[in-house]
Amino acid sequence: MEFWGIEIKPGKPFKVIQKDGFMVHASQVTLGDVEKVKKDETFAVYVKIGDDENGFMIGNLSQKFPQFSIDLYLGHEFEISHNSTSSVYLIGYRTFDAFDELDEEIDSDSELDEYMEQQIAALPQNEINPEEDDESDSDEMGLDEDDDSSDEEDVEAEAPLKVAPPSKKMPNGAFEIAKGGKKNKSSGGKKRCPFPCGPSCKK
């Protein structure tokens, strides 16, 4: 990137031809000598691109507005002109042409694709027997089925756990309580005294 500028004299269009791979970024247009123009006069600035005969107006200059800013990328060949009685200056900077680099990359990519296609076409074609492929696929499917059947057998081999029924025996102490509550036939239906005090006991 470097500074770039030209002077366009009255009645003399300025033609610019860039080197390959470069372009101009124009950023400002300025009227040279304001005193040479009248207060009420307005002058137009034109640009032509390549071999195009039609020019495009990019702005107006006057004594009140002696300059204006632009943002134009101008390619390989262009021409600047105006209808002012004073010189006009166009400034900006020169930079690399990104579009040319892109075109080169596209060309290189297309060449690479063609080269790869040629190399692939030159390779011998592998002879593949479709029947062998089918057999290998069926073998793989058979292995999968065997795995599934073995899983089912494992599930069937696991017998369910048996739960023991609840015991009919009484809990500890319950039998003694029940036994103590029964009537003693030998004592006439009275409860047996737990104390060994003999026949004199009144309880």
From Swiss-Prot:
Coiled coil: none annotated. GO terms for biological process: chromatin organization; seed dormancy process. Its main location: nucleus. Residues 121-203 are annotated as: Disordered. Gene3D superfamilies: Nucleoplasmin core domain. One of its GO terms (cellular component) is nucleolus. InterPro entries: NPL. Pfam families: NPL. GO terms for molecular function: hydrolase activity. Residues 129-157 have a biased composition (Acidic residues). Keywords: Chromatin regulator, Developmental protein, Hydrolase, Nucleus, Repressor, Transcription, Transcription regulation. Residues 180-193 have a biased composition (Basic residues). It is found in: Nucleus, Nucleolus. The keyword Hydrolase applies. HDT4 is not required for the cellular patterning in the root epidermis. Belongs to the histone deacetylase HD2 family. This is Histone deacetylase HDT4. It comes from Arabidopsis thaliana.
